[in-house]
Amino acid sequence: PLIRDFEVCRSAIIEMEYSHMTKSISHIGDFIEQTSKRNKGCVIQNVLSVSNSQGFIQQSEQFENRIVASDNTSNYKIVEKNDFAFNPARINVGSIARLTTFEKGIVSPMYICFRAKDNLYPEYLDYYFESKHFFTEIQKRLEGSVRQCLSFDGLCNIPLCVPTVKIQQRIGKRLSALVQEIKLEFDFLGLLQKQKRFLLYQMFI
């Protein structure tokens, strides 16, 4: 129940903080820039994917027992810490993320990559991508008859209300604190479950 309460609280704060987006006269494109630096010479070997539930993960974790990346990754795009990437064909199910767990990595050329400009706190944008408003705006901008995709221009046209950097940081830190609390509770629950299994095992030895 405690974990669920934290998650409900986090979702409620996100919706409250970003509920004024319909009044915005700015757009995401005013605050981000696209990146497309390639992995020339195949220097970076850390191949990443974007999961709709886990964010950036190593491709080997997402596709166990399968080699998905090409032997030649020179055309793969480089992502650095706090960069964002999304799969144009899967953003409608949440496949968009900010890189936080690695300093650098590479992603398939199909991904669209971008980063926040100096006047936008990356965490503020990151949490906006979890809001109902963002997913509503995505649906209006999907293109394609067979497989609907969101282009970078489509992303840039989405309204975004951006307060001062100080307020952005306050919102980001507030939500990050809740995320950390949820993680700690999940970790504690995992330890309790291990302890339970151990005790049950000892009972039947």
Regions found by a protein language model. Give the residues of each.
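Extended amphipathic alpha-helical segments enriched in small hydrophobics
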Residues: T164-L189
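Amphipathic alpha-helical segments that mediate coupling or scaffolding at interfaces
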Residues: M16-E17, F31, Y128, R141, ...
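DNA target-recognition domains and sequence-specific DNA-contacting regions of bacterial/archaeal
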Residues: G29-V162
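Glutamine-centric residue-chemistry signal
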Residues: S11, Q59, F135, R147-Q148, ...
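Short amphipathic coiled-coil heptad-repeat segments
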Residues: P1-S24, D187-I205
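Non-catalytic DNA-recognition/assembly elements of restriction-modification systems
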Residues: R4-G41, N157, C161, V165-K166
